[in-house]
UniProtKB/Swiss-Prot annotation:
InterPro entries the record matches: MTA_SAH_Nsdase, Nucleoside_phosphorylase_d, Nucleoside_phosphorylase_sf
Pfam families referenced in this protein's UniProt entry, alphabetically: PNP_UDP_1
GO cellular component terms attached to this protein's record: cytosol
Name listed for the protein in its UniProt record: 5'-methylthioadenosine/S-adenosylhomocysteine nucleosidase
Pathway membership: Amino-acid biosynthesis; L-methionine biosynthesis via salvage pathway; S-methyl-5-thio-alpha-D-ribose 1-phosphate from S-methyl-5'-thioadenosine (hydrolase route): step 1/2
Protein's organism: Shouchella clausii (strain KSM-K16) (Alkalihalobacillus clausii)
Length: 231
């Protein structure tokens, strides 16, 4: 089994890279790919850069050049649900865009014309993520993750997104693009995000303080997922 793992920033991938053996690094179009092994699992770890275009580019290259059996996106996000706190984990059961509006043409809000309204992660990967979350001991929830090309630090926009997507647990900047590309390639995927901040509530201060810790929380869950998938 070969698993592709994508993180946007160095803080989101360095913990996993340090755990890899037999590493071989390649850079394509400013996207960093590191092949190697974590335990019994062959891994291609990808640092894609921030935002939807960077994420789509890296996910396309990952699928085309390395052909993984599945893709896991790890990283941090801004929380949208009052029941969750910084450091908690969100496991995707659905991924949508919060910054796409083609409703005038009859599409759902968040739906890219010609594409599905929501991208659904693989059930086996969701189950593995849930098992890993229980083992690692972090509080986790499963549900909707929304994506857009903006940091959710402005209270008015946060409230707009909450109104549009009341079921959303968190917002971030890459998952929707990763999910859309995986949908096109028919590659199973799941998104794992740890909360680095609560969107709109001193979000930047919290993000700066908790980025690395939350990123490691997400990466630790991915490590346990790999153990489960290789069993």
């Amino acid at each position: 089994m070969k698993i592709g793992i994508i993180g946007a920033m160095e803080e989101e991938v360095n913990f996993l890279r340090d755990k890899m053996e037999n590493r071989v690094a390649t850079t394509i179009a400013n996207c960093e790919f590191t092949e190697g092994q974590i335990g019994a699992v062959q891994v291609v770890l990808t640092r894609c850069g921030i935002g939807k275009v960077n994420a789509a580019l890296a996910t396309t290259l990952l699928n085309d050049r390395f052909q993984p059996d599945a893709i896991i996106n790890t990283g941090v996000a801004g929380g949208l649900n009052a029941s969750m706190a910084v450091g908690d984990l969100v496991i995707s059961t659905e991924v949508r865009y919060h910054d796409v509006d083609a409703t005038v043409f009859g599409y759902e809000y968040g739906q890219v014309p010609g594409m599905v309204p929501a991208y659904l992660p693989d059930a086996t990967l969701i189950a593995a993520a849930k098992t890993a979350a229980q083992k690692v001991g972090f509080h986790s929830e499963e549900g909707l993750i929304v994506t857009g090309d903006s940091f959710m630090g402005e209270e008015t926009r946060v409230n707009e997104v909450k109104t549009l997507f009341p079921a959303a647990y968190c917002a971030e900047m890459e998952a929707g693009a990763i999910a859309q590309v995986c949908h096109q390639f028919q590659t199973p995927f799941v998104i794992i995000r740890a909360l680095s901040d609560v969107a709109g509530q001193d979000a930047k201060m919290s993000y700066d303080t908790f980025l690395e810790k939350s990123a490691v929380n997400s990466a630790k869950q991915v490590m346990l997922m790999l153990d489960h998938l290789s069993a």
